[in-house]
Curated annotation (Swiss-Prot):
Listed GO MF terms: enzyme binding; transcription corepressor activity
Free-text function comment from the UniProt entry: May act as a component of a corepressor complex that represses transcription.
Basic and acidic residues bias locations: 30-43
Top-rank lineage group of the source organism: Eukaryota
UniProt organism field: Rattus norvegicus
The protein's name in its UniProt record: REST corepressor 2
Positions bearing Phosphoserine: 31, 35-36, 63, 202
């Protein structure tokens, strides 16, 4: 066997095939590829020696210690344990998610860090802030702008969103990419119109080519097919495929019969918009001006509302009159009595309004005053004047006898009759009738308030003074003490004067044993 490879010496390391072929033992003729091999001899050299051979280490058996010393590439996030039940784990995850904003992976990682101790994990959740994985509207807008500038270079996108990690950016990109295929109706319509224009241009070009190739068409022949159909039929296969693609491209729009919400289409508007691009721009400018004017109106209305709101916050306290913090008192002073009579003259039996006018009297106290001082201040005539102003005609009182016979009696007359019956004393009690009082003063006109009778001054000491007539205790039968004089009685002789046909106000009643003074001037 001829020696092709010799043992290398210290100075020689490479043996070429050309030297082996020129050896005296190789008597084979040269093949046709010898010339090509000689040209590329540097590519076919055999490299022998330690410089060109790999050093193979000794075989070591596999052992667990071999992998224990290696650095772990990942981090263990969660490892289940039997000491934590599923219900307790779900409760812990829900609390971490709702209260601290952790997701499931972060909450389980915290629990694993504390060796499945739920209490320690819950206490330590507030000490860390989880990475936000939620995308706000601002983040989405920034991502779209950054993607428009930099494309899929997420390192540059992260420079515009420094609080987002690259995995989060990639994850949001694929979810955002799915929504890009959803185009609006207006965009689809624009694409359709653009496709139609391109198709018309191409048809015109093909029609011109067909006319040049075929010569002038015969316009008098009605059986000749139109020229645009021939280039379409004569187009090769790829052209027909393109037509089919454009035909079925907008197939989903066939099912949509109505425009989207808020868009109203009319033939006039479409004709005006599609007529010329300048007209469409003018229409948009007009709409923009209307929008700007509406925004100005909204801004002015907001300013007006804010000023009114500030005025309402002040309240009506500055407009209220100053009110003194008076306490309710059951005693009636002379000024309060006169004020009550004037209030009755103006408000009638509206005791609530009268109590508000006086200020320190309740509704019950005003009613008691009306019943108690009806005779003293001639409140019936005051009410008649008030009713005359309300109705426009005076109402004369009805006698008690007619009321007993069945005639309609006003409420004031019935109340007066009841008061006389309640305050009357049994006839078995002896009493002395004093002489008749002096004639009453002439009646006053209805336009002026009635004269006010001043109560007589007490002659006895304050402790021995008798109570005024017509108090609330009149509804009970008075018990006469053995050494106490009888109470003052109302003279019943006035009942006969009611039968007289003389119209006009009646004189005030007199009290037995009371000294009358000349009336005070009218208010």
């Amino acid at each position: 066997m001829p020696s092709v490879m010799e043992k290398p010496s210290a100075g020689s390391g490479i043996l070429s095939r050309s030297r082996a072929k020129t050896a005296p033992n190789g008597g084979q003729p040269h093949s046709e590829d010898d010339s090509s091999e000689e040209e590329h001899s540097h590519d076919s050299m055999i490299r022998v020696g330690t410089n060109y051979q790999a050093v193979i280490p000794e075989c070591k058996p596999e052992s667990p210690a071999r992998y224990s010393n290696k650095e772990l590439k990942g981090m263990l996030v969660w490892s289940p344990n039997h000491c934590v039940s599923d219900a307790k784990l779900d409760k812990y995850i829900a609390m971490a998610k709702e209260k601290h904003g952790y997701n499931i992976e972060q909450a389980l990682g915290m629990l694993l860090w504390h060796k499945h101790d739920v209490e320690k994990s819950l206490a330590d959740l507030a000490n860390f802030t989880p990475f936000p994985d939620e995308w706000t509207v601002e983040d989405k807008v920034l991502f779209e702008q950054a993607f428009g500038f930099h494309g899929k270079c997420f390192q540059r996108i992260q420079q515009m969103l420094p609080d987002k990690l690259i995995p989060s950016l990639v994850k949001y990109y694929y979810s955002w990419k799915k929504t890009r295929s959803r185009t609006s109706v207006m965009d689809r319509q624009a694409r359709r119109l653009g496709g139609r224009k391109d198709k018309e241009d191409s048809d015109e070009l093909e029609e011109g080519r067909g006319a040049v190739s075929e010569g002038e068409p015969d316009t008098g022949d009605p059986k000749r097919e139109p020229l645009p159909s021939r280039p379409l039929n004569a187009r090769p296969g790829p052209g027909k495929k393109e037509i089919q693609v454009s035909q079925y491209r907008h197939h989903p729009l066939r099912t949509r019969r109505r425009p989207p919400k808020g868009m109203y289409l009319s033939p006039e508007g479409l004709t005006a918009v599609s007529g010329s691009p300048d007209l469409a721009n003018l229409t948009l400018r007009g709409l923009d001006s209307q929008l700007i004017s509406l925004k100005r109106q909204v801004q002015s209305m907001k300013q007006t509302n804010s000023s009114l709101r500030q005025a309402l916050e002040g309240g009506i306290d500055p407009l209220r009159p100053p009110e003194a913090n008076t306490k309710f008192n059951s005693r009636w002073t002379t000024d309060e009595q006169l004020l009550a009579v004037q209030a009755i003259r103006r408000y009638g039996k509206d005791f609530g309004a009268i109590a508000e006018v006086i200020g320190n009297k309740t509704l019950t106290q005003v009613k008691t005053f009306f019943v108690s001082y009806r005779r003293r201040f001639n409140l019936e005539e005051v009410l008649q004047e008030w009713e005359a102003e309300q109705d426009g005609a005076p109402t004369a009182p009805v006698p008690v006898e007619e009321a007993r016979r069945g005639a309609p009696v006003p409420a004031t007359a019935l109340e007066e009759d009841d008061e006389v019956q309640i305050t009357s004393v049994s006839t078995s009690v002896p009493r002395s009738v004093p002489p008749a009082p002096p004639p009453p003063p002439p009646p006053t006109s209805l336009s002026q308030p009635p004269p006010l009778l001043r109560p007589p001054l007490p002659t006895a000491p304050t402790l021995l003074r008798q109570p005024p007539p017509l108090q609330q205790g009149r509804f009970l039968q008075p018990r006469l003490a053995p050494n106490q004089p009888p109470p003052p009685l109302i003279r019943p002789a006035l009942a006969a004067s009611r039968h007289s046909a003389r119209p006009g106000p009646q004189p005030p009643p007199t009290l037995v044993g009371a000294q009358l003074e000349p009336p005070a001037p009218s208010l």
